[in-house]
Design a protein with these regions (language model features):
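N-terminal nucleic-acid-engaging modules of covalent nucleotidyltransferase systems
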Residues: 2-175
Length: 175
């Protein structure tokens, strides 16, 4: 006699859902040594003033601080005429450009009053155009906006946020 295997009775199928753990949203970060336009885009994308200030603190570098001072300090007088600059944008992909604002930061003093007043106006403007042509178009746009004090028109960053993020900056008395 062959015995047939008996089937085990099935248990009732009541499924109890496990509580879902909410993961904290991963904070997007920038690559090491980010370009100034990447930093400003990231800071602008932050929703709160506190988050913007923290982002400015985290990604502080000399080029960023110089651009922000040029833009927000009313005593910094640009020696480059206001308005659009006739230059040919660099069409190289970002990162393969001839230069970056981090490298050009040390030459920005040529373009403000008190920096290199002995420089001929035409030579100064030629140097400015050459610098812009070596930069990625996004960084060149930032320099043009900063020279006219119009950075806040394109990026959601205010003087108060910069002042809070960088309390060591002495504002005023530069010209």
């Amino acid at each position: 006699m062959t015995s047939t295997p008996q089937k085990k009775p099935r248990k009732s199928s009541t499924v109890v859902a496990k509580p879902v753990k909410k993961r904290a949203a991963k904070k997007p970060t920038l690559p090491p040594n980010p370009f100034v336009n990447e930093i400003l885009d990231y800071v602008s994308s932050q929703k709160s003033k506190i988050a913007k200030v923290e982002a400015l603190k985290e990604y502080r570098n000399d080029a960023l601080v110089s651009i922000l001072i040029w833009n927000f300090d009313e005593t910094v007088i640009s020696m480059i005429p206001e308005g659009d600059v006739p230059f040919t944008p660099n069409d190289s992909p970002q990162g393969t450009d001839h230069t970056s604002l981090r490298r050009e930061q040390r030459n920005l003093y040529h373009f403000v009053k008190g920096g290199n007043d002995a420089l001929n106006g035409i030579r100064r403007e030629t140097m400015f155009i050459q610098m812009l042509e070596g930069l990625h178009p996004s960084e060149a746009r930032i320099v043009i906006l900063a020279k006219d004090g119009r950075l806040s028109e394109e990026y959601a960053i205010t003087y108060e946020q910069v002042k809070e993020a960088y309390p060591d900056i002495q504002w005023g008395g530069r010209s």
